[in-house]
């Protein structure tokens, strides 16, 4: 009985409400694995450049989480960005190549900002930069973002 009480006590002692994390996802288009002045993969000395000077990227990489094994699900940028936003492959989110009326299904998909708000409604989300909406002009706000720089038409 004493062992049970100790286990229950210890399990409740360490239950502390953690603050929600700040999440900043920076995605660069056509970023080379060796296009920065720091090791993209600390285990591989070939994963940096002595030519490029990227002190701000280096500082971010040193103080944040670094993803070293990312693979594009498509050979061009739009379906890749939409896969990151939804966690789905292009075959599942239905954007594979420019075509009209593809956004009908896409607008219904869960996205990172929508999921964050489901977990905690006080999350504030924003999107700045490339927003490719060649057809149907769906907006970042429709995908769950609170703030954006709008349709950038690229």
Predicted regions and their residues:
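Formylglycine-dependent sulfatase
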Residues: 3, 16-154
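Sec-dependent N-terminal signal peptides
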Residues: 4-14
């Amino acid at each position: 009985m004493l062992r049970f009480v100790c286990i229950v006590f210890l399990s409740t002692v360490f239950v502390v409400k953690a603050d929600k994390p700040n999440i900043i996802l920076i995605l660069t288009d056509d970023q080379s694995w060796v296009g920065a002045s720091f090791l993209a993969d600390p285990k591989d000395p070939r994963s940096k450049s002595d030519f490029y000077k990227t002190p701000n990227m280096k500082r971010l990489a040193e103080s944040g989480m670094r993803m070293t094994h990312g693979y594009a699900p498509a050979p061009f940028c739009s379906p890749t960005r939409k896969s990151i936003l939804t966690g789905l492959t292009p075959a599942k989110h239905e954007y594979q190549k420019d075509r009209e009326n593809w956004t009908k299904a896409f607008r219904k998909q869960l996205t990172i900002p929508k999921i964050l708000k489901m977990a905690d409604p006080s999350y504030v989300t924003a999107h700045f930069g490339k927003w490719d909406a060649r057809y149907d002009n769906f907006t970042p706000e429709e995908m769950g973002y609170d703030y954006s720089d709008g349709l950038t038409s690229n």
